[in-house]
Amino acid sequence: MKTFKQITLLLMCVSLITFTSCSNDDDGGDDGGGVAAASGTITANINGDSFTSLEMTSFANSTTGGGQTTLIMQGNTQSQAINMIINGYDGVGTYQLTDENVFRTASYIEPNVSNPTNTQTWTAPYQDSGVCGEIKITEETDSTVKGTFNFTSKNSNDDTTKNVTEGSFNLNKQ
């Protein structure tokens, strides 16, 4: 779990560096092809509050090694992030988040840039969570991946939970 938190923190730092080094260039996006998220973004409700990632810090990336594919999807704002990892990715379909398969994870993160050790992360699945959500890939092309998601996540520091609902993504692949 400590390694996972370190990897998540590293991904957040890379995203923040990317955010500060990019120019302001908005291509407008498209209608999302039936997915609520605008092109290049992740949207969701976090305990009822709206989240929409910035296009310049949102991406999907798939890597194949050892006969297995891993899909990573990430998007963040200046103060929040959502990160989803599907190990054993096999294209369009539904991937359950359950404590029986800890190789599929989703996280909601509130980074603390001035003091990274105080970054708060809520992760799904967690111990004894059972099925706590799903990631549904509805469309994949050579350049994009689209779908929906929802999950209940837990903060291992204070045992609080965050309900991430009505999630959708329309991400460009790197």
Model-predicted regions and their roles:
Residues M1-L9:
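Bacterial N-terminal signal peptides that target proteins for export
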Residues T3, I17-N47:
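Bacterial Sec-dependent N-terminal signal peptides
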Residues L10-T18:
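Bacterial N-terminal signal peptides
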Residues I42, M56-D142:
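Surface-exposed helix/loop patches within compact recognition domains
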Residues F51-S53:
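Short, isolated positions in well-ordered beta-strands
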Residues G133-Q174:
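C-terminal or internal capping secondary-structure element at the end of a domain, subdomain, or sheet
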